[in-house]
């Protein structure tokens, strides 16, 4: 056994495994990276639902949970800490293996100092948010914009796999975009790149593709036209009605597509991207694809980008948080190993 392999084994970073069917059999001993050398926590800190998941260093998800909470940020953090304990019990992994956490926020996160601003949830912009989370979770915490993490996941495991340049447009309770250029997130100088909510601020509702505005548009149409749709005009029910050829449902989907295309338009015109991925509770509906593509083809004087729906659906944000967490955990694990070897 080489000294390098022995040191990795002593550090718990590799483990003995079964023989390779394609390799030699006589006296050979096989090793693999130990995915349980550490585990990471991913959190999608949404405005309505908080999603949590644990995964090992190989990216294997060991446990998941959803928390539906409308309480204060402090109450949500308490619920999050309780969820992590539940995840550890479910996964049967010891808590001391938890290496770090990545928390996705519906907010701008400064790339310089991690400061949170433009948050959809009151209290999320507290200056000590990361410290609150680290006290509750007892591990280092990284804060990141939720749409940025969705784009990371989509590039690694989704429809944008092996695509160097693309945009991810998340349309749900809020609106935001993430832009990947040459395989890297383009954050902007202050982390504000893709904050499309600021673009629609102060403008009329007929450019707003978010869930509340889409539901209100359905309610207005339902007051004048026959439909099977009923209050509160849930977005998913609207898309289901459109699939059943309900006239109001079809009209709402067409209008939602027009509004989404209005926000894809500047991305396509200024960045000349080959791909735009739609996600979120509104955006991730396949019924939007044909009308969005049609509107873009009509408006753009040059070929429109390919428009696709996220392959990961509502899991895109949490998957991105886990991917970022694994990257950070591997770096921390090997840094500690190097420090031990140097001392």
Protein language model regions, located:
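Short glycine-rich anion-binding loops that position phosphate/pyrophosphate groups of nucleotides
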Residues: 20, 106-109, 172-174, 282-283
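ATP-binding/phosphotransfer module of carbohydrate and carboxylate kinases, centering on a glycine-rich
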Residues: 2-19, 23-68, 72-96, 203-343
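Short glycine-aspartate micro-motif
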Residues: 40-44, 98-102, 166-170, 176-178
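Short, acidic, Ser/Thr-enriched surface-loop or helix-capping motifs
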Residues: 56, 111, 180
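Short glycine-/acidic-enriched loop or helix-start segments at secondary-structure transitions
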Residues: 112-114, 153-154, 178, 287-289
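Short beta-strand-loop/turn "lid" adjacent to the catalytic site in phosphate-handling enzymes
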Residues: 92-125, 275-280
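Glycine/GP-enriched mid-protein hinge/lid loop-to-helix segment characteristic of carbohydrate kinases
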Residues: 64-66, 72-76, 124-125, 132-147, ...
């Amino acid at each position: 056994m080489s000294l390098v392999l022995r040191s990795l084994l002593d550090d718990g970073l590799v483990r003995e495994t079964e023989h390779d069917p394609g390799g030699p059999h006589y006296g050979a001993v096989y090793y693999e990276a130990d995915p349980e050398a550490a585990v990471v926590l991913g959190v999608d800190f949404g405005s309505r639902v908080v999603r949590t998941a644990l995964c090992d260093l190989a990216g294997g998800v060991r446990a998941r949970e959803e928390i539906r909470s409308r309480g204060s940020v402090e109450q949500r953090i308490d619920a999050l800490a309780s969820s992590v304990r539940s995840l550890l019990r479910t996964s049967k992994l010891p808590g001391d293996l938890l290496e770090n956490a990545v928390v996705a926020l519906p907010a701008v996160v400064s790339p310089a100092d991690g400061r949170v601003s433009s948050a959809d949830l009151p209290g999320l912009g507290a200056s000590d948010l990361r410290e609150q989370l680290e006290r509750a979770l007892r591990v280092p915490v990284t804060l990141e914009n939720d749409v940025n993490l969705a784009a990371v996941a989509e590039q690694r495991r989704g429809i944008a796999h092996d695509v160097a340049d693309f945009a991810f447009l998340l349309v749900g309770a809020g609106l935001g975009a993430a832009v990947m250029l040459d395989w890297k997130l383009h954050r902007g100088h202050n982390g504000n790149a893709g904050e499309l909510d600021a673009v629609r601020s102060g403008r009329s509702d007929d450019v707003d593709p978010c869930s509340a505005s889409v539901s209100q548009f359905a309610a207005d149409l339902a007051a004048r036209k026959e439909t099977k749709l009923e209050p509160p005009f849930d977005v998913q029910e609207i898309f289901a009605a459109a699939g059943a050829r309900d006239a109001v449902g079809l009209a709402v989907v067409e209008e939602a597509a027009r509004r989404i295309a209005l926000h894809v338009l500047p991305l396509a015109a200024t960045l000349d991207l080959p791909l735009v991925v739609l996600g979120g509770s509104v955006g991730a509906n396949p019924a939007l694809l044909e009308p969005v593509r049609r509107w873009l083809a009509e408006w753009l004087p040059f070929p429109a980008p390919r428009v696709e729906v996220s392959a990961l659906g509502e899991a895109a944000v949490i998957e991105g948080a886990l991917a970022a967490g694994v990257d950070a955990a591997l770096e921390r694990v090997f840094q500690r190993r190097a420090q031990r070897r140097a001392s």
